[in-house]
A protein has these predicted regions:
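Low-complexity, Ser/Thr/Pro/Gly-enriched N-terminal "stalk/linker" regions
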Residues: 1-76, 81, 85-89, 100-101, ...
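Structural helix-adjacent loops and short alpha-helical linkers that scaffold large soluble proteins
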Residues: 17-31, 86-115, 149-162, 216-229, ...
Length: 473
């Protein structure tokens, strides 16, 4: 635990958590800057006559400005998912009467305009639900479509979820008892090009099971439930080593289900422990436990979390791979930290429900420390909202002339202000891929899913009643 923790704060009457740590984390999670950064990017689409087809992924060479990907790329759902998380947050704060002091500013987008941008940014994503050439439909659809349904009962989003789940299920193979991840995989070291010979499954795919479980419950479809559970069991069997570190990729024989190879595509080596892969495993197995309540999945998630925590450096932010040589320039991965933190919050929730407060509190402390250490080292400088001047427009008048008039009864325009070179992402220090044989290497940048899971962590704290407990201590 960090030495600047300060005196303990009592949460829900039992957890004793460092006050300074909680305060720093909550100020970052619920700051005006968080909303302003997302709004700055989202509002660029307000004046367009057509919905977006390009979606933010990572920051470029300037470490500040987003590089965009096409709507069919696997990360397309995270930015609109972030918009929906912030829209949901307004409801959670209101319902729980939790008002962190950093969110009290009146300058914020109107909820209806916020809702419009949520729908606008997702208008072109519904078509992805029909794709059967990718395992990433959970990432591409669930972050925004589940919120669109739960918040607004959006029937289009509901239909998209159902279509996406069945499209994803079409990639399940009875012989392998899992969902195919990649049809092909090509690096400077190897090339898998024939799906009839190779059945590639990655640890990341655990996060795509949630959409199957969700639709299975909504539509009473046992087949979707069974497919999701079978995939989790197969991943337990093949992706997890005896020491509970994880393999990234497992190649199975598509006819027999026998293991042909185990290797990495984004880690340091085939035998190393890629940090984000370990994090995907923690959160994925916890989501599976939440749906099935089978203790084996909980135990697996806990074991993976313990490896993650045991291998953290002293400053609490994971290197991109736990087995990569440690140097002054070795990249970190803040996305791995945020994904793992969300998984550990679910561990807290699970063990609290099982009435094991000691274990529950351990993982709550661990999750908070992960976020706190990330905030201390990798939170980008803040931006803020500022009201623009009274709006003046040109109005057509007789004799082909115009005159100026102030708009009446309208909220002043909001603009986002900050340092001239302020980053568009909330966090920096992420690493997409630093594998030496990768076609391209990315490290030390902002990343949309690092920010998404940072925002999700805040909403999870609200849902668990932890934020208002601290605010009213």
């Amino acid at each position: 635990m960090s030495t600047d923790a300060g005196p303990p704060a009592t949460i829900n009457g039992t957890e004793n958590l460092p006050t300074k740590q909680w305060t720093r984390v909550l100020e970052a999670l619920f700051s005006e800057s968080v909303l302003a950064k997302v709004w700055h990017v989202a509002s660029k689409a307000i004046g367009s006559t057509t919905p977006p087809t390009l979606y933010p992924e990572y920051t470029g060479s300037d470490k500040s400005t987003y590089i965009y990907r096409t709507l069919d790329f696997w990360t397309s759902g995270f930015f609109p998912g972030s918009l929906y998380l912030l829209l949901e947050r307004n409801t959670l704060l209101r319902e729980r009467h939790a008002t962190p002091h950093s969110t009290q500013a009146n300058l914020r987008p109107h909820p209806l305009q916020h809702e419009h941008l949520c729908r606008w940014w997702t208008a072109n994503l519904h078509q992805n639900a029909l794709r059967k050439d990718t395992h990433d439909l959970g990432f591409m659809i669930a972050p925004w479509a589940i919120k669109a349904w739960t918040l607004h009962r959006d029937p289009a989003a509901y239909n998209t979820l159902i279509l996406a789940a069945h499209s994803l299920a079409s990639r399940f193979n009875e012989s392998t008892q899992c969902i195919r991840s990649w049809d092909e995989c090509i690096t400077k070291r190897y090339a898998y090009k024939d799906p009839s010979q190779d059945y590639l499954v990655i640890i990341d795919n655990m996060l795509n099971l949630d959409i199957l479980f969700w639709v299975a419950r909504e539509t009473n479809c046992r087949r979707l439930y069974d497919i999701a559970k079978a995939h989790a069991i197969t991943t337990q069997k093949h992706h997890i080593r005896d020491d509970y570190a994880t393999f990234h990729v497992v190649n199975l024989d598509p006819d027999t289900g026998e293991v042909k190879d185990k290797f990495t595509n984004q880690g340091y080596s085939d035998s190393s422990c890629w940090a984000r892969g370990q994090a995907w495993g923690i959160l994925g197995f916890m989501q599976t436990y939440e749906w099935t309540k089978e203790r084996g999945f909980l135990c697996t998630a806990r074991a993976l979390a313990d490896v993650f925590l045991d291998r953290l450096p002293d400053d609490g932010v994971p290197y991109w791979d736990f087995d990569a040589p440690v140097t002054d320039t070795e990249p970190r991965d803040t996305s791995a930290a945020m994904i793992a933190a969300c998984g550990m919050l679910l561990l807290y929730k699970a063990y609290k429900g099982l009435r094991d407060r000691e274990i529950a509190d351990h993982y709550l402390h661990a999750a908070m420390r992960l976020v706190d250490c990330t905030v201390k080292g990798y939170l980008n400088p803040p931006v803020r909202f500022e009201a623009g001047p009274a709006s003046v427009v040109s109005v057509y008048a007789d004799q082909h002339s115009t005159h100026q008039t102030e708009r009446q009864n309208l909220v002043e325009a909001l603009k986002v202000v900050g340092d001239e070179h302020a980053a568009e992402t909330i966090l920096t220090g992420a690493t997409i891929n630093n594998y030496e044989f990768a076609p391209r290497r990315w490290s030390n940048h902002g990343l949309i899913y690092a920010d998404y899971y940072f925002l999700l962590f805040g909403n999870m704290l609200l849902e668990m009643g932890l934020v208002d407990s601290l605010m009213h201590r």
